[in-house]
Amino acid sequence: MKIQAVFIDGFKNLANVRITFDNITTLVALNDFGKSNVLSGIDFGLSFIKASIEDKKDMMSNSQLIPGNCNLIGRNYKYEMEVAADIDGREYLVQYGYEFEWKDTEGKEPEIISEFLKVKLNEKGQKYAQLINRTAHTAFYKSSETGRCSSIIKVGETELVVNKLRAYDELYYALIITKLNGIKINMGNNLEAKSFCQSDSVIRKGFDNASINEDNLPQVIYRLKSQYPDKFALLKEAYIQLFPEFEEIIVKDFQLNVEEDHQLRENAPFQFTIAVYALFVKRKGLVNPVNFSTISDGARRVFMILTKIIVASVSNISLIAIEEPDNSVYSGLFGAYIRIIRELSAGCKVIITSHSPYFVSCLDPSGIYVGINRKAGVAEFFPFKKSGQKQLVNDAVSLDLRMGEYLFSMLADSESNIRDYLEWDNE
């Protein structure tokens, strides 16, 4: 499944945040605005779908996530998304969402009060068919292709219909239900890359093609090189383009003698690895390779981010987040860095956060969402109008400024006319 758009409301300081994803979508705002909250809100929304009923209840009671701004008190959490799903060679557009009441006062129990699922074939003239329709007191689903969305289904106050329908194998849209429950994103924080350079001796079981992740970078790179040599070559080529002082990326495995009776119990989710992996780089002018952990934090972080993008392409990940990539390389490389991210991420959406005028200047305004406070402390994000995109660039040039410099000068000026460039509603 490929994520096309999301909507988040009532999460931390976020209000009515609607993002339609481009290949690369960038959230731009001043420091400490709420950019990371958008990433957390997306992650929360999908994690909630996958969580158990008990975990859902805990998530709905998390005081760190409940809106605390005086303008948002009592606001429900809403999560909606639009995804594209390929089924039997045909593309379907899927709209799914839910709403719940937070446990924001003592004695109040959290409750899911709304849920919907709509699907249509992505062809001209097709209309959405409603497959799930839920309110606070009733829940319906469509039980047959020719029927209506009128079959009653009983669900608990902290249970989603889309979860319960996983057991209904006979449904004609069962594959869509399965895909919705299994959609994968990677919103992990990349700001600290050093820990990824360590190799763990205890790993999660089932470390196969589908579960490649960045929990252990040397092991990920070893598996990538072994199972997807073309992807490893692509990663290495992209990295050396940005850091030409490096000649080679080297990963080694050191076999361990782990006897069967020294393994963890059979039903444990972890096991001792049979090898320890180490990552090295060969730098021009040096006789011997150096351990990856000894190079600069920025260079490590860029490698981590590029690996994350490559892994997404072999792990069927729909969306990945990159926080402040401008902290990793000097400004002269911003353009090349963005180009490489775009090339490597084909088939996977990327959402970026940035507060760097110079980095933003290298972006296409059509993929930028600007963070604005219309009410004190409430974070909203707005895209540029089509006419505003060209006007922004032209106005920046007329002032002898880069586009990003002009944009941030308006963000810092409460009297600026920035709303003239944005798709601004009149709320």
Q: What are the roles of these predicted feature ranges?
A:
Residues 1-54, 271-427:
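Switch/communication elements of ASCE P-loop NTPase nucleotide-binding domains
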Residues 40-109:
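Conserved P-loop NTP-binding catalytic core
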Residues 95-247:
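Electropositive, glycine-dotted interaction segments
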